């Protein structure tokens, strides 16, 4: 007992010395640290099934997220939906457009308040990451999107000649930036999303030849990594009106990883929330499906998936009721944190079922 008291006294003296030298809050007991003990706060993604798969109701605040995939797979669309959801909740968002390709009209259609969005189109990778750091350090930004890592061109490469080899310059740039950013991001509770592109590794005989740009640092620092792919076309007659999209959570530090979900991205309007809702609700028998007819609370609400989507758009109160029941079923509460006793992996809706319903 005396030994324990001596140890306790020694620890208190050491903690006092640390606080004197480095300031109050530089060391503390974990149980007394309220910010560390609270539930993970999250921002919805615009897709209910993806919110459930991520385990906390969306992308977590104070963390780094990587969204990667092939061209035209929906990476920017997903990020703009996250920005729109953050703005709906009164958040301030920033967009570092290194690709110089942001479509403002499309962003508005997805619900982004472009008048309130902070936009930067930097010339170099160093400038882009410096701007990102300054915005995060302000402590006022809720979501910051960097689009994309592949477009962060180092200054040395810009000033050099075409054909010059610059081995590992971009990887070193990303590694240094993430070392500087990671602590500030956690303190400011900013969700920083990096969009990334896919490249092919040369000479890979076995395994996956795909890799992401910018080295390995982002893979380590990211709390969540989302692999987004276009897996099919949604047609209205002969016209392609959207894409069936699959997202796999390949890394997740705040919930179990490797969940997969599918949803519709409609051209011009983004993620189909109603379609996502129908798939989840019918899987859990909240909405009953008999042949091509869908029923809710014993009443038929439409024949065919597209007609039901239109019905839910016209009757938002019914859509809200169904959404509430779905979220309750999967254990996502008002705080966004899932109940540990409930299953959080959504069943994956099948593409064939969708096309048959249409």
Curated annotation (Swiss-Prot):
ATP binds at residues 69-76. GO terms for molecular function: ATP binding; ATP hydrolysis activity; ATP-dependent DNA damage sensor activity; damaged DNA binding; single-stranded DNA binding. SUPFAM superfamilies: P-loop containing nucleoside triphosphate hydrolases, RecA protein, C-terminal domain. Its main location: cytoplasm. One of its GO terms (biological process) is DNA recombination. Residues 331-358 are annotated as: Disordered. This is Protein RecA 2. It comes from Myxococcus xanthus.
């Amino acid at each position: 007992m005396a030994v324990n008291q001596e140890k306790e006294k020694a620890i208190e003296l050491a903690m006092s010395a640390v606080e004197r030298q480095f300031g109050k809050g530089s060391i503390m007991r974990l149980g007394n640290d309220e910010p560390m003990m609270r539930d993970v706060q999250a921002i919805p993604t615009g897709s209910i099934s993806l919110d459930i798969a991520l385990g906390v109701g969306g992308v977590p605040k104070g963390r780094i997220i990587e969204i990667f995939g092939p061209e035209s797979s929906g990476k920017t669309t997903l990020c703009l939906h996250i920005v729109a959801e953050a703005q709906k909740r009164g958040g301030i968002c920033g967009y570092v457009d290194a690709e110089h390709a942001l479509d403002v009209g499309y962003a508005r259609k997805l619900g982004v308040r472009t008048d309130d969005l902070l936009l930067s189109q930097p010339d170099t990778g160093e400038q882009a990451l410096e701007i990102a750091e300054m915005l995060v350090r302000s402590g006022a930004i809720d979501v910051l999107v960097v689009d994309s890592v592949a477009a962060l061109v180092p200054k040395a490469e810009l000033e050099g000649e075409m054909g010059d080899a610059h081995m590992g310059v971009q990887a070193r740039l990303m590694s240094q930036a993430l070392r500087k950013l990671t602590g500030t991001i956690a303190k400011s509770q900013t969700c920083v999303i990096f969009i990334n592109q896919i490249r092919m590794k040369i000479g890979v005989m076995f395994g996956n030849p795909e890799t992401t740009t910018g080295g390995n640092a982002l893979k380590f620092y990211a709390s969540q990594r989302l692999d987004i792919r276009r897996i099919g076309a949604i047609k209205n007659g002969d016209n392609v009106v959207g894409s069936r999209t699959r997202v796999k959570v390949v890394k997740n530090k705040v919930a179990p990883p490797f969940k997969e979900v599918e949803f519709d991205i409609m051209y011009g309007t983004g993620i189909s929330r109603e379609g996502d809702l129908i798939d989840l609700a019918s899987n859990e028998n909240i909405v009953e499906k008999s042949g091509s007819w869908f029923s809710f609370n014993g009443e038929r609400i439409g024949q065919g998936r597209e007609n039901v989507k239109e019905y839910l758009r016209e009757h938002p109160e019914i859509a809200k009721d169904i959404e509430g029941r779905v979220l309750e079923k999967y254990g996502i509460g008002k705080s966004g944190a899932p109940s540990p006793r409930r299953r959080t992996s959504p069943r994956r809706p099948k593409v064939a079922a969708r096309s048959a319903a249409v």
